[in-house]
Amino acid sequence: MSPQTETKASVGFKAGVKDYKLTYHTPDYETKDTDILAAFRVTPQPGVPPEEAGAAVAAESSTGTWTTVWTDGLTSLDRYKGRCYHIEPVAGEESQFIAYVAYPLDLFEEGSVTNMFTSIVGNVFGFKALRALRLEDLRIPPAYSKTFQGPPHGIQVERDKLNKYGRPLLGCTIKPKLGLSAKNYGRAVYECLRGGLDFTKDDENVNSQPFMRWRDRFLFCAEAIYKAQAETGEIKGHYLNATAGTCEEMMKRAIFARELGVPIVMHDYLTGGFTANTSLAHYCRDNGLLLHIHRAMHAVIDRQKNHGIHFRVLAKALRMSGGDHIHAGTVVGKLEGEREITLGFVDLLRDDYIEKDRSRGIYFTQDWVSLPGVLPVASGGIHVWHMPALTEIFGDDSVLQFGGGTLGHPWGNAPGAVANRVALEACVQARNEGRDLAREGNEIIREAAKWSPELAAACEVWKEIKFEFPAMDTL
């Protein structure tokens, strides 16, 4: 009789409850190249040994339940169970441990981030034996990542489509995010694109409200794009947010965007859901649309240090589900992001092969094989004085997005865009000439401002603006 069909009739079924660690804590297990590996930060309840807590996580996120069941004998648990194969204390934290769990690949549906998360984090986070639980990292084996399409196009294809090389891309979120009419919204888009930006953007909560229905916004933004392209000779885009209450409505909006001939659409992937996002990503590849991803709601999931899911996991999931851009923090602006940790998941978004590096929060070596990369988007409370630091931190393969830092310019939207474009070009030129952006950044901006009155005005407005709060996301 095969292992999968062998029963326990010969030994008799013994009902009852036994410790998880007897079955799911396997410190001698050697991980396989095809296993999905997870690193959980576990905070057990008082009196619960870390081995039992780690084993409980492995059990409840794979084949286990609270009691022995008769149907265990109808399959091979050794083949399908998750295994807690290593536990280590968290330095500097009391009663916190990193539990490493290996999952056999057969537990997961191919090409489904939804199923992967339903298994690994779907139920275990409410387990009473744990005070708190955080998924810090996942190792996605090539055998699984190859079942995903991934980003619709990727970094190089996007550059080729836009004919823009050798520098970060520049964007702007239109403000106020809610309340503008479609025509005034389109006017703001045109002014920003005419001034030198590559992209403008719908804010995450701009969908189809009474003051501005989606079809009207799409039409006026398309008009703005074509007018700005004709005047500047550059390819322009606006992230048209296709997020909607149903997948059918979302696809209808994406189809209309394609019919208008615009280059890019947008989706809120966490509030919209991974199933909807993957469907949209497939449509975008098939129809030549770039896909910008907003991470609205991420901080509800990832901001607490001891409970939830770290953003590096959500970033990996997005690369699998599909997106050409994703917001990734700024390090220097108003939103969360500690430098080394942020650069860790930026590399996980962009690079093909990323070595394990615990100093940057990377618990596993990740090999994406040929899955296209994702451009990280720096957005939130940034302005021209941040440009040298952003250029140095994020490099060329990034999108730098200035909302208030464009639209808050004292002379208007187009001069605000000019100021940002001049600051960026000055920083890129200085870097290419061998200057140190970290040390000489302010001087570089001041030099450029001498021949750009728009930049000089922006420098004066934002010279005192800083967001100096400690990052919550630390190792």
UniProtKB/Swiss-Prot annotation:
<feature type="binding site">
    <location>
        <position position="173"/>
    </location>
    <ligand>
        <name>substrate</name>
    </ligand>
</feature>
<feature type="active site" description="Proton acceptor">
    <location>
        <position position="175"/>
    </location>
</feature>
<dbReference type="GO" id="GO:0019253">
    <property type="term" value="P:reductive pentose-phosphate cycle"/>
</dbReference>
<feature type="propeptide">
    <location>
        <begin position="1"/>
        <end position="2"/>
    </location>
</feature>
<protein>
    <recommendedName>
        <fullName>Ribulose bisphosphate carboxylase large chain</fullName>
        <ecNumber>4.1.1.39</ecNumber>
    </recommendedName>
</protein>
<keyword id="KW-0560">Oxidoreductase</keyword>
<keyword id="KW-0479">Metal-binding</keyword>
<dbReference type="InterPro" id="IPR020878">
    <property type="entry name" value="RuBisCo_large_chain_AS"/>
</dbReference>
<keyword id="KW-0460">Magnesium</keyword>
<feature type="site" description="Transition state stabilizer">
    <location>
        <position position="334"/>
    </location>
</feature>
<feature type="modified residue" description="N6-carboxylysine">
    <location>
        <position position="201"/>
    </location>
</feature>
<dbReference type="GO" id="GO:0000287">
    <property type="term" value="F:magnesium ion binding"/>
</dbReference>
<keyword id="KW-0934">Plastid</keyword>
<keyword id="KW-0488">Methylation</keyword>
<keyword id="KW-0120">Carbon dioxide fixation</keyword>
<dbReference type="InterPro" id="IPR000685">
    <property type="entry name" value="RuBisCO_lsu_C"/>
</dbReference>
<feature type="binding site">
    <location>
        <position position="295"/>
    </location>
    <ligand>
        <name>substrate</name>
    </ligand>
</feature>
<comment type="function">
    <text>RuBisCO catalyzes two reactions: the carboxylation of D-ribulose 1,5-bisphosphate, the primary event in carbon dioxide fixation, as well as the oxidative fragmentation of the pentose substrate in the photorespiration process. Both reactions occur simultaneously and in competition at the same active site.</text>
</comment>
<keyword id="KW-0503">Monooxygenase</keyword>
<dbReference type="InterPro" id="IPR036422">
    <property type="entry name" value="RuBisCO_lsu_N_sf"/>
</dbReference>
<feature type="active site" description="Proton acceptor">
    <location>
        <position position="294"/>
    </location>
</feature>
<dbReference type="InterPro" id="IPR020888">
    <property type="entry name" value="RuBisCO_lsuI"/>
</dbReference>
<keyword id="KW-0007">Acetylation</keyword>
<dbReference type="GO" id="GO:0009507">
    <property type="term" value="C:chloroplast"/>
</dbReference>
<comment type="similarity">
    <text>Belongs to the RuBisCO large chain family. Type I subfamily.</text>
</comment>
<comment type="subunit">
    <text>Heterohexadecamer of 8 large chains and 8 small chains; disulfide-linked. The disulfide link is formed within the large subunit homodimers.</text>
</comment>
<feature type="binding site">
    <location>
        <position position="204"/>
    </location>
    <ligand>
        <name>Mg(2+)</name>
    </ligand>
</feature>
<feature type="binding site" description="in homodimeric partner">
    <location>
        <position position="123"/>
    </location>
    <ligand>
        <name>substrate</name>
    </ligand>
</feature>
<dbReference type="InterPro" id="IPR017443">
    <property type="entry name" value="RuBisCO_lsu_fd_N"/>
</dbReference>
<dbReference type="InterPro" id="IPR036376">
    <property type="entry name" value="RuBisCO_lsu_C_sf"/>
</dbReference>
<keyword id="KW-0150">Chloroplast</keyword>
<dbReference type="GO" id="GO:0009853">
    <property type="term" value="P:photorespiration"/>
</dbReference>
<dbReference type="GO" id="GO:0004497">
    <property type="term" value="F:monooxygenase activity"/>
</dbReference>
<dbReference type="GO" id="GO:0016984">
    <property type="term" value="F:ribulose-bisphosphate carboxylase activity"/>
</dbReference>
<keyword id="KW-0602">Photosynthesis</keyword>
<feature type="binding site" description="via carbamate group">
    <location>
        <position position="201"/>
    </location>
    <ligand>
        <name>Mg(2+)</name>
    </ligand>
</feature>
<keyword id="KW-0456">Lyase</keyword>
<keyword id="KW-1015">Disulfide bond</keyword>
<feature type="binding site">
    <location>
        <position position="327"/>
    </location>
    <ligand>
        <name>substrate</name>
    </ligand>
</feature>
<keyword id="KW-0113">Calvin cycle</keyword>
<dbReference type="Pfam" id="PF00016">
    <property type="entry name" value="RuBisCO_large"/>
</dbReference>
<feature type="modified residue" description="N6,N6,N6-trimethyllysine">
    <location>
        <position position="14"/>
    </location>
</feature>
